[in-house]
From Swiss-Prot:
Its EC number is 3.6.4.-. It holds the Pfam family ATP-synt_ab. GO terms for cellular component: cytosol. InterPro entries: AAA+_ATPase, ATPase_F1/V1/A1_a/bsu_nucl-bd, CSD, NA-bd_OB-fold, P-loop_NTPase, Rho-like_N, Rho_factor_ATP-bd, Rho_N_sf. GO terms for molecular function: ATP binding; ATP hydrolysis activity; ATP-dependent activity, acting on RNA; helicase activity; RNA binding. HAMAP family: Rho. Homohexamer. The homohexamer assembles into an open ring structure. Keywords: ATP-binding, Helicase, Hydrolase, Nucleotide-binding, RNA-binding, Transcription, Transcription regulation, Transcription termination. Residues 48-123 form the Rho RNA-BD domain. Facilitates transcription termination by a mechanism that involves Rho binding to the nascent RNA, activation of Rho's RNA-dependent ATPase activity, and release of the mRNA from the DNA template. Belongs to the Rho family. This is Transcription termination factor Rho. ATP binds at G169, K170, G171, Q172, R173, A174, K181, S182, G183, K184, T185, V186, R212. It comes from Chromobacterium violaceum (strain ATCC 12472 / DSM 30191 / JCM 1249 / CCUG 213 / NBRC 12614 / NCIMB 9131 / NCTC 9757 / MK).
Length: 418
């Protein structure tokens, strides 16, 4: 019997199962207690129970398997992992573990892991010899994530324009700079849809920090990938814990040579949360930012890299500007030079309902010659020279008309020849 299968069932289905297994007072129990009772019942019959989760190692040496469905929140149905298992299999925070579990004995509160079957989808022996993420060699991105698709929908235009103006590669550290109400969340959704459609082998994680609950639900329903969230009514410590879990999980996957993409909305709110959490150093920068507060969000953002030994970690993070808060401007200024790709959104275009509201002259990718073939690069440069003297609004409208008139970017380049 699988713990995660029970978690996905509705309460009414669990109650029916409990009644058929003759558990007393089933309809008065909470969902967690129902799962507990059912699993205990199975264990009494001598059946094995299996569980899975993402490991969080606590300072005391032991750890727990947290569930991605609850965004790694500590709960009563977490699975305890003993220090000896962690040492034996060389486990770290962020490892995804599957294995056999047992019900709590007297005086225990949690399920316990008995046998480790898989670590990050592979046999546990394999993870002993992997190179740690910190020791891998970072390189410039050399392989592009194509965001253009074979559909004639509105959202394909977003992907095609990003492919032209600031292409995203495997291992890109991209900053999406956006004033409020400029369509950044929708743009992230479009990027997520394009990546899941064109690159199914990539592991996609959408991390929503300090977002509105209805946007979280919309993301979960529209994106085929893992959506991890911490809404704006949660404390700052929770934002920080979620972000740490996600980045550790991503690092473990990169060590197994996987391509991981994290879409973060937004790094500004994450930096604010860290600013609340860090102990006061006594030095305060403009806008009330503590001098040490930005080191950890920079470590999060700086983890994005293309790895020579195989695998890559791509992070597309949104940074808020023009919110009227000095702190947000300071945070943006600190992150400005750290990314190797920038996408600037424009408030004026969004107010005129031109989407994607991309500012062409200010957006771009460093070393894009490594991502884009040489013949296309010449054309893109010609296009930029043509669009430079125009007003930002006119340039975007002109580019959109030309893109809507052609079926694909290749056709668009061919039409430029004429």
């Amino acid at each position: 019997m699988h713990l995660s299968d029970l978690k996905h069932l509705h309460v009414s289905e669990l109650v029916e199962m409990a009644i058929s297994n003759e558990i007393d007072g089933a309809n008065r129990l909470r969902k967690q207690d129902l799962i507990f009772a059912l699993l205990k019942n199975q264990a009494k019959k001598g059946e094995s129970i299996f569980g899975e989760g993402t490991l969080e190692v606590l300072p005391d040496g032991f750890g727990f398997l947290r569930s991605p469905d609850t965004s790694y929140l500590a709960g009563p149905d977490d699975i305890y992992v003993s220090p000896s298992q962690i040492r034996r299999f060389n486990l770290h925070t962020g490892d995804s573990i599957e294995g056999e579990i047992r019900t709590p004995k007297d005086g225990e509160r949690y399920f316990a892991l008995v046998k480790v079957d898989k670590v990050n989808g592979e046999a546990p022996e394999n993870s002993k010899h992997k190179i740690l993420f910190e020791n891998l060699t970072p390189l410039f991105p050399t392989e592009q994530f194509k965001l253009e698709r074979e559909i004639r929908a509105e959202e394909n235009i977003t992907g095609r324009i990003i492919d032209l103006i600031s292409p995203i590669g495997k291992g890109q550290r991209a900053l999406l700079v956006a004033p409020p109400k400029s369509g950044k969340t929708v743009m992230l959704q479009h990027i997520a849809h394009a990546i899941t459609a064109n690159h199914p082998e990539a592991v996609l994680i959408v991390l929503l920090i300090d977002e509105r609950p209805e946007e979280v639900t919309e993301m979960q329903r529209s994106v085929r990938g893992e959506v991890v969230s911490s809404t704006f009514d949660e404390p700052a410590t929770r934002h920080v814990q979620v972000a740490e879990m996600v980045i550790e999980k991503a690092k473990r996957l990169v060590e197994h040579k996987k391509d991981v993409v994290i879409l973060l909305d937004s790094i500004t709110r994450l930096a604010r949360a860290y600013n609340t959490v860090v102990p006061a150093s006594g030095k305060v920068l403009t806008g009330g930012v503590d001098a040490n507060a930005l080191q950890r969000p920079k470590r999060f953002f700086g983890a994005a890299r293309n790895v020579e030994e195989g695998g890559s970690l791509t992070i597309v993070a949104t940074a808020l500007i023009d919110t009227g808060s000095r702190m947000d401007d300071v945070i943006y200024e600190e992150f400005k030079g750290t990314g190797n790709s920038e996408i600037h959104l424009d408030r004026r275009m969004a107010e005129k309902r031109i989407f994607p509201a991309l500012n062409i002259n200010r957006s771009g990718t460093r070393r894009e010659e490594l991502l884009v073939p040489q013949d296309q690069l010449q054309r893109i440069w010609v296009l930029r020279k043509l669009l430079y003297p125009m007003d930002d609004l006119e340039a975007m409208e002109f580019l959109q008309d030309k893109i809507k008139a052609t079926k694909s970017n290749q056709a668009f380049f061919d039409s430029m020849r004429r």
